[in-house]
Curated annotation (Swiss-Prot):
<comment type="function">
    <text>Subunit of STT3A-containing oligosaccharyl transferase (OST-A) complex that catalyzes the initial transfer of a defined glycan (Glc(3)Man(9)GlcNAc(2) in eukaryotes) from the lipid carrier dolichol-pyrophosphate to an asparagine residue within an Asn-X-Ser/Thr consensus motif in nascent polypeptide chains, the first step in protein N-glycosylation. N-glycosylation occurs cotranslationally and the complex associates with the Sec61 complex at the channel-forming translocon complex that mediates protein translocation across the endoplasmic reticulum (ER).</text>
</comment>
<feature type="short sequence motif" description="Prevents secretion from ER">
    <location>
        <begin position="133"/>
        <end position="136"/>
    </location>
</feature>
<keyword id="KW-0256">Endoplasmic reticulum</keyword>
<feature type="transmembrane region" description="Helical">
    <location>
        <begin position="76"/>
        <end position="108"/>
    </location>
</feature>
<feature type="topological domain" description="Cytoplasmic">
    <location>
        <begin position="109"/>
        <end position="136"/>
    </location>
</feature>
<dbReference type="Pfam" id="PF09775">
    <property type="entry name" value="Keratin_assoc"/>
</dbReference>
<dbReference type="GO" id="GO:0008250">
    <property type="term" value="C:oligosaccharyltransferase complex"/>
</dbReference>
<keyword id="KW-1133">Transmembrane helix</keyword>
<keyword id="KW-0472">Membrane</keyword>
<dbReference type="GO" id="GO:0030674">
    <property type="term" value="F:protein-macromolecule adaptor activity"/>
</dbReference>
<protein>
    <recommendedName>
        <fullName>Dolichyl-diphosphooligosaccharide--protein glycosyltransferase subunit KCP2</fullName>
    </recommendedName>
</protein>
<dbReference type="GO" id="GO:0018279">
    <property type="term" value="P:protein N-linked glycosylation via asparagine"/>
</dbReference>
<feature type="topological domain" description="Lumenal">
    <location>
        <begin position="56"/>
        <end position="75"/>
    </location>
</feature>
<keyword id="KW-0812">Transmembrane</keyword>
<comment type="similarity">
    <text>Belongs to the KRTCAP2 family.</text>
</comment>
<dbReference type="GO" id="GO:0008047">
    <property type="term" value="F:enzyme activator activity"/>
</dbReference>
<feature type="transmembrane region" description="Helical">
    <location>
        <begin position="35"/>
        <end position="55"/>
    </location>
</feature>
Amino acid sequence: MVVGTGTSLALSSLLSLLLFAGMQMYSRQLASTEWLTIQGGLLGSGLFVFSLTAFNNLENLVFGKGFQAKIFPEILLCLLLALFASGLIHRVCVTTCFIFSMVGLYYINKISSTLYQAAAPVLTPAKVTGKSKKRN
């Protein structure tokens, strides 16, 4: 199901806010065991994806369709936000958030490039049809 840019901006902003609030409400529980600290990093990675989606949708509304997110400032700003939110829980959450965010960013980039990039024409070299002389 495809939603518009404005609706996607509202949904991703709301999910970012709810995820950040949930991470702060349950920060003691997320920091209590090893597995939950890893889950805290996974939640931070989700915060990264949702905030990047909201930021890019806002740019598309302001600057027009076809505006793409670049590494600086969009991706770094959203990554720092997610790492800061994970750091408020536990130090290990920062590391796992970074790892999960990089994996998520790789797959977002892979899906985006297959959907939105035009295929470059492949040039094949022309076959030479003629006699070639051997030189010694």
